[in-house]
Amino acid sequence: MREGLTDILVPGLHSVHGPGKIQGTVFFNEQMAFNRDVSVMLLRSLDKGVTVADAMAATGSRSVRIAKEVPGTEVTANDISADAVAYIDANIELNSLDNCVSSNRNMHSLFAEHSFDYVDLDPFGSPVPFTQSAIRGCRRGGVLAITATDTAPLAGAHAVKCRRRYQAEPIRGYMCHEGGLRILMSSIARELAKFDRGMKPLLSFYADHYFRTYLRVEEGAEAADRTLGRLGYLQYDKDTLERSIAYDKDPVHPYGPLWLGPLHDKDFLAGMKPDDLADEKRVTKYLNLWRNEIDTEVFVYDMSELSSHMKLSPPKIDAFMEFLNQHGRAAKSHVSPSSFKTDITLDELLPLYKEFSPDSC
């Protein structure tokens, strides 16, 4: 099959939609083409001459796309499975690449011996067992790119598993996907701090069935302390829609710890270009959402939740954003088509929602 500018040999039996299932000996999920598109786009915005490690490369689809579509990269496509490495080697040969090499190692041993400018960790399920090794393998000032597909724990459907795996209390309901993303980022921040390292998010998002974050690693105890200082907790009352955050845990703020800093580096996003990708239309749509969303406001509102609370029909979200921007700042969020963020307080927002509802016209 062809993805972006790259030809990829994949198993005949593979996942096409949704959270993939392991079928056969080597995993491949067509729906993750968007994830791979974003990796290519982001890497093109980094400095040239980047060394890349794809820690769990499977077929090597991400690795060979990066090697072929991002100039100046040197890529190591690693997988512990010999069957996977056979696919990687075939894909390197298929695309005539001299800047991509295969590696058949346990990723923990690979990163104990080698370090890279960009480390990609995209496991089947949770990244938690592998995060420390990925951090070891990331050079000073490098970038960690980490995926989590265990959305049920992170989004609160399996809260006990989230507590055990991420040492965090998840939130259910319409905030669940932003909450899950911020729990993942909090978990990585705490692991980085063990190495006297901090992080600056370049891009973080929820899409399809997974969470994904790209983090610039910052060195030193001050960076670690600064990062830990951006972790905190959420209070939310579903009856009143009131929410607040706190940087120290207390009985009033049960959800977290969460990353409370920005999800993206807006200056970095401004330089990203969605050209020559597998699904340019979708990447462009998300890139515009990421660039415009108000990620300094920590949690989203949802049109359906406001409608239910107010017992009013919801207005069209685009028109409502225009209306709200006459009173403050507001923009749609990427986490769902009906979600948005605003710096307008809840006490101000509810009367404005009532005023703009079709039922009030």
Mark where each language-model region is:
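SAM-dependent transferase fold signal centered on methyltransferase-like domains
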Residues: 1-361
